[in-house]
Amino acid sequence: MFAVKVKICGLTNYGDAAAAAEMGADMLGFNFYPKSPRYIKPADAVKIIDRLPAFVDIVGLFVNDTFGHIEQVIDECRLDWVQFHGDETPKYCEQFGTLNVRTMKAIRVKDEKDIKLAEEYYTDAILLDAFDPKKYGGTGLVFDWNIIGNISKRVFLAGGINAENITKAVELGIYGIDVCSGVESKPGKKDHAKMRKLFDMIQDLRG
């Protein structure tokens, strides 16, 4: 039996968000990075968030954004989590400790040195994603999970997670998984059949 949190990221419409929540998602992610194909304006995200059940945590993804703008979106969208998915430093992330929000730093992993970097961040969680020189997340790439080792923080695993590799991901003993492109029909649009298959498998693993 495995207890693992499930985060569905890159949501752009109510139908996908509601379906993810109904299927069992613990966290729903909205991408506020304008250059992403999954970008959603905060004003549009609010319209979706307002209709979602209270039991799901709302996560806002940002890339190299300003403190002021992120603080504004936290208030506007009533975010539970802020996910830093760019080149944010530990010092930059620490300043959000004054706000009523939990924080998660994404580490884009190339090798074991990047895994060690996770220990430098005093965030509520660490998200390990595959490195891509041109993209900040949502690439569908998978890094070598065997190098993860022991990290003294809550670890979310991202990068190409789907129904085919979910069992191996969960067996790593991580805190949560972050799924985006693995359950999409195209960037920003979820494939509900893929989501259902994924959640059915997770339910079996949870026991």
Model regions: which residues?
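Conserved N-terminal beta1-alpha1 strand-loop-helix module at the mouth
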Residues: 1-207
